[in-house]
């Protein structure tokens, strides 16, 4: 490995110390280290700061120091560059991070010697059509969410799968999630958890009315079409909980499997189910 990008979330505790230490060790091993401009300013190495475009072109791996939100942002931003991402958890839950902040030094040798594997995660593409014209497209690692605005009024979302009518969901909205996103908002909305090595999509209604409260798991080869049937409420499309777009009555959102994949660096021999146990129960048998 000849070059590494470091993306620290400068709002997190300990981030300056850990970033500085990693920069020093990687540089001592003759690895070219690039940082975001704000990351470079944080540790006083302004000359190492580059734009995201440059980092995508020169880095062979990107190390992210932050929480799941920081990793999600990097996954979308660097998906076109096909670069493996290593997450170091400085947040709370950390489903996407591979190691915790206090484990960095223990696993650094494995990273330097190439003793790791790469796990690919399916991503989603969401396209908004207005008057049958495409007006914007987003990529997501976790989920695409259609949700009502601040007022307590039910919205209706007509949903089709592969062009076939499925259901018109009355409620607070709809979630289309990847397996990776099944442990996020969809899980909180009552959806099941899907193993991360599967390539499927899941549709989960948000606070649905009466008998509409079941998730539907579909093939990743299908296209989900969700159409707004509401003209009296603010409805927003949210991508990975980070990007938003205001929808209008009659807008269609088409969600499908993306051509991009997120590549996650795996340093630990830990199955998805072991990770699940650690995050949900603290690693205890209950």
From Swiss-Prot:
It is found in: Cytoplasm. It comes from the Bacteria. Belongs to the NAD kinase family. The active site is at residue 68. InterPro entries: ATP-NAD_kinase_N (IPR017438), ATP-NAD_kinase_PpnK-typ_C (IPR017437), NAD/diacylglycerol_kinase_sf (IPR016064), NADK (IPR002504). NAD(+) binds at residues 68-69, 73, 142-143, 153, 172, 183-188, 242. This is NAD kinase. It comes from Natranaerobius thermophilus (strain ATCC BAA-1301 / DSM 18059 / JW/NM-WN-LF). GO terms for biological process: NAD metabolic process; NADP biosynthetic process. One of its GO terms (molecular function) is metal ion binding. It catalyses: NAD(+) + ATP = ADP + NADP(+) + H(+). Keywords: ATP-binding, Cytoplasm, Kinase, NAD, NADP, Nucleotide-binding, Transferase. Its cofactor is a divalent metal cation. One of its GO terms (cellular component) is cytoplasm. Involved in the regulation of the intracellular balance of NAD and NADP, and is a key enzyme in the biosynthesis of NADP. Catalyzes specifically the phosphorylation on 2'-hydroxyl of the adenosine moiety of NAD to yield NADP. Its main location: cytoplasm. Its EC number is 2.7.1.23.
